[in-house]
Curated annotation (Swiss-Prot):
Organism name: Euglena viridis
Family: Belongs to the cytochrome c family. PetJ subfamily.
Name of the protein in question: Cytochrome c6
Intracellular or extracellular location(s): Plastid, Chloroplast thylakoid lumen
InterPro entries membership: Cyt_c-like_dom, Cyt_c-like_dom_sf, Cyt_C6, Cyt_C_IC
Highest taxon listed in the record's lineage: Eukaryota
Gene from which the chain derives: petJ
Keyword Transport: yes
Length: 87
């Protein structure tokens, strides 16, 4: 599931939708609208997962296609729900 992929690969930096490396670049909808190339869209989230940026590594070739899709969907859904007020 997307939650499992996130927990196993992303949560060390993005615990509860936050960001321990770059404060402010959290995984809330409003924050992603500001800093993510393409804004808060599944396409923009997937691009970031695949290619990385700055200190975030690229996950293409590490995660398989289904894992990339699952974690993209998970981040997208959490961003406007439980992580809406992430800091």
């Amino acid at each position: 599931s997307g939650a499992e992929v996130f927990g196993n690969n992303c949560s060390s930096c993005h615990v509860n939708g936050g960001n321990i490396i770059i404060p402010g670049h959290v995984l809330s909808q409003s924050a992603m609208e500001e800093y993510l190339d393409g804004g808060y869209t599944k396409e923009a989230i997937e691009y970031q997962v695949r290619n990385g940026k700055g200190p975030m590594p690229a996950w293409e070739g590490v995660l398989d296609e289904s894992e990339i899709k699952e974690v993209t969907d998970y981040v997208y859904s959490q961003a406007s729900g439980p992580w809406a007020n992430a800091s």
